[in-house]
Amino acid sequence: MRTLLLLVLVAFAAPALAQRSYDQDVLGALLGREAPLPAAPPAYAVWHVEHESGNSILARHALYERAGEGDVALGRERLALAQLLGETEAGLLRTGDTLVLPARPADFDLSPLAYAPYPREWPGAAEIDKAVVVDKTTQTWAGYERGRLVRWGPASTGAAETPTPSGRFTMNWRALERESSEAPPGERWLMRYVMNIHAARGIHLHQYDVVPTGPPQGHGCIRMVTSDAEWLWGWSDGWQTTAGPGALGGRPTAPGTLVIVQGEEPDGAPLRFVDGPNGPERVAVMLPPDPLAVPRGDR
């Protein structure tokens, strides 16, 4: 009986201990949303999942009702934003849980750029056509055009034992699909929209079906959700070579899009919010004053 009880406890504990990953369909809809971008970021607050009955279903219903300003369906739709902010998806919330969300329900409907941990303007990159930043501390990435933020999203870098190298890179060769060489025998790890930044070590930005929300677990590459990887593939440029743009063979004649990798791998959940004088505040990613002065990371 004791053995059976132990097995039951393990079976129920395993899902709770498992690493969560982003719902890529939900994020794809959010990241591609065209909506107003206010001059200042929204204020945030701690939202509580609670109901006098203690019932989690009723507590979630109350949360939806509050977020939707009385419209439960709208509130459920708005709560999808929790995933972009790295919070627990609404359907998994239980009584007693808390999550950080915009303080005003109307601020759930803004442009995804409004929720970015990155500055809207990067003066140091104002003369650079396109620049990409990967921040390991927050496990996010961002794209800038002439110093203006145009896209951002979640990312998952290398684990502490196989870290993504920091420094300045440029995009090299690229491939629409590629199988990872890190896959165990008999397994097939397919990557799409592969954009290499370190040829010698095989470090890429790429799409992957599993992008963890917690500590990074990769082998050095930068995992991205499908919508972001596809966007970045179309927006960025690989190197120019005598064999063609972004080709694996040939002699390089011009570098591709600039990529800066910075920060430190988090031990636990990535840093997303900090305590401010009036409540939680979005963490602010600091960017280098001169990205071209950042030491190269591929040497």
Question: Model regions: which residues?
Answer:
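Cleavable N-terminal signal peptides
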Residues: 5-6, 16
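N-terminal signal peptide c-region/cleavage motif recognized by signal peptidases
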Residues: 11-14
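Exported/periplasmic cell-wall-interacting domains
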Residues: 19-22, 178-299
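Extracellular LysM carbohydrate-binding repeats and other cell-envelope/extracellular binding modules
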Residues: 23, 27-28, 35-39, 74-117
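Primarily a LysM-type cell-wall glycan-binding module
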Residues: 26-76
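Extracytoplasmic
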Residues: 41-44, 77, 94-98, 126-129, ...
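Solvent-exposed coil/turn segments that connect beta secondary-structure elements
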Residues: 87, 104-106, 137-139, 146-148, ...
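A structural motif detector for short, solvent-exposed N-terminal "entry" segments of globular domains
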Residues: 114-160
